[in-house]
């Protein structure tokens, strides 16, 4: 038996490659449409959010056994963290492309929410950074994927700008706000998870439309790029079940009022709002999984002890391991 055969990462890669070969053989929809063999997923992140980005990526890789290209709209992520994320993706035969974004490009856009970075505005200009792909899934960093993204990826958006889930916090509780930003009579979507038709975005010059909309509603908009996307995409959105973007508000509506029909299983848990999956106060669906994923990642790639400091909900045994890593690092 060779050293290579006993190598943990090689074994995992081999298993993953086998899964993807099987997946490619069945990678067609029942209605006959061919689905792209490579899934394109976009994140936007700065240096501080890199550990959470890695965990979110890992949750996708574990649940979606196929070749994935990850495109990171990169706001000054340092090289060490880039290397860690690249190593994680490579262990599962996936690729990561870091696309430098200059935050000054969006300095005139309003920052109305303290816990949302200006990095989110970068996606308004996606076609500048990402070339030669027709479709992509955009996912916020504050998410954990619970099952395969294949069903989401398969959705036909040929005649739409994007597919998205209703934002029940706005749609159910803030109808008056929609009127304020010109969306009376339209459903309002949460922009944390989007299936994007990049061909349409290029044809319609979405970035210029974003600037025009922002200039008109700058004094009244509250939810940054999410408001902008709702404003410029109204009438061109394919609304999908909230199982693809399950928020704390969705959970509350189901528990208290049963006003929302969500099919099972929940594909993506979205920790929008101030309490994220790495916070002690977070109680949203599967928030504890973030810590477990961090621990599992550490068995696959060597992550720095400082990453554990980013997670408040750390089990006792992981705290011990963190202490040992600090001693070793020093």
Curated annotation (Swiss-Prot):
Molecular-function GO terms, alphabetical: glycosyltransferase activity; metal ion binding
Keyword Glycosyltransferase found: yes
Record-listed UDP binding positions: 44-49, 140-141, 270-276
Gene3D superfamilies linked: Spore Coat Polysaccharide Biosynthesis Protein SpsA, Chain A (3.90.550.10)
Regions of compositional bias (Basic and acidic residues) in chain numbering: 1-31
Domain of life: Bacteria
Family from the record: Belongs to the glycosyltransferase 8 family.
Protein name listed in UniProt: Putative glycosyltransferase HI_0258
